[in-house]
């Protein structure tokens, strides 16, 4: 029995949809889908209807793309209302979400809890010399503007940063309530640490990539593995003896060079895993 993970499926691309349909079944295994499935409820439902039939259990966390409110999609759900609609859709297929009790890993090895999280970002992944109120201006200097600024609405929160603060506070309370000594697999769409945002071509895009409030969560909450996506740069990194897995598939041009069975090779094995 294995725990796999993948993220950034971006199913609005036809090649990605075809690859999804070609993915072999893993009837004994679990799968983490770490956000950015697509932009529409139909794309989300395509993922759920496909992967819940091929894996014993699917665990989903939202990326930014799922939370977009597109002018063409009805109903026009925004912010928390859209997120809750996605949660309801997952539950209708038996997939777990950040709003459900954290599942215990039933596979071999010591006791572990899988922690799907929805945290968002608060523009703090930036150099210390950049003031908070200048973060967007700092990105604009490099001609960068994330589509979230137009399509990702924070209602009923005052801002995306305020929504992030509320999610961090609520998630921290749940993590603090875990049994002492219980190991975790932490799952979030965004990296938990600023140092892991490796974007050499667009370094100032980092402000839309997480929050510094989670910098020590891998040790504070006894993580064996931290799973994230968003960067479209698959990698295995180590920090403080903890394995960090960036599990993005990405856009067709980013994964096609991996060959015909790209999706199969992009499924990252989370458990059991290597040692440092």
Tell where the protein language model's regions lie, with residue ranges.
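N-terminal active-site segment of His-dependent metallophosphoesterases
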Residues: 1-60, 66-72, 157, 275-276
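Active-site neighborhood of phospho(di)ester-bond hydrolases with catalytic His/Asp-centered motifs
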Residues: 5-7, 31-36, 59-64, 96-101, ...
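Short, solvent-exposed loop/turn segments at secondary-structure junctions
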Residues: 10-11, 38, 65-67, 104, ...
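Metal-dependent catalytic neighborhoods of phosphoester/phosphodiester hydrolases
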Residues: 15-19, 39-53, 65-93, 106-109, ...
